[in-house]
């Protein structure tokens, strides 16, 4: 039986420090998602990305102005 792929937003970062800051920020603010290795389909600076279901992405976008680190890219990907 084949696994059904789901739609995700993949957020990449220029460095691992920003990726770890994203994880801490999301845990402290009870925001969805998790750190993953950057998928092969994507090229990224640090090799670590944040994966969040598409339906939950708006929760992150609302809090983005409170984050003191930068996102590199936001990519839609079926995984």
Pin down the residues of each PLM region.
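Short amphipathic alpha-helix segments
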Residues: 15-32
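Short, flexible, solvent-exposed loop/turn segments with mixed acidic/basic and small polar residues
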Residues: 1-2, 36-41
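Short proline/glycine- and acidic-rich turn/helix-capping motifs at secondary-structure junctions
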Residues: 40-46, 76-79
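Short glycine-/aliphatic-rich beta-strand segments at the starts of folded cytosolic domains
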Residues: 2-12
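Short secondary-structure transition/capping segments
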Residues: 3-4, 46-48
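Short aromatic/hydrophobic contact patches that present stacked aromatics
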Residues: 10-12, 47-51
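A short linear hydrophobic-aromatic micro-motif
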Residues: 32-38, 72-73
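C-terminal structural segments of small proteins and small subunits
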Residues: 51-79
């Amino acid at each position: 039986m084949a696994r059904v792929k789901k739609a995700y937003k993949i957020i990449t970062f220029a460095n691992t420090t920003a990726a770890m800051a994203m994880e801490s920020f999301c845990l402290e603010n009870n925001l969805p998602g998790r750190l993953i290795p950057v998928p092969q389909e994507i090229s990224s600076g640090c090799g670590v990305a944040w994966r969040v279901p598409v339906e939950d992405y708006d929760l992150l976008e609302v809090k983005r102005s409170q984050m003191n680190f930068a996102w590199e890219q936001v990519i839609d990907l079926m995984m």
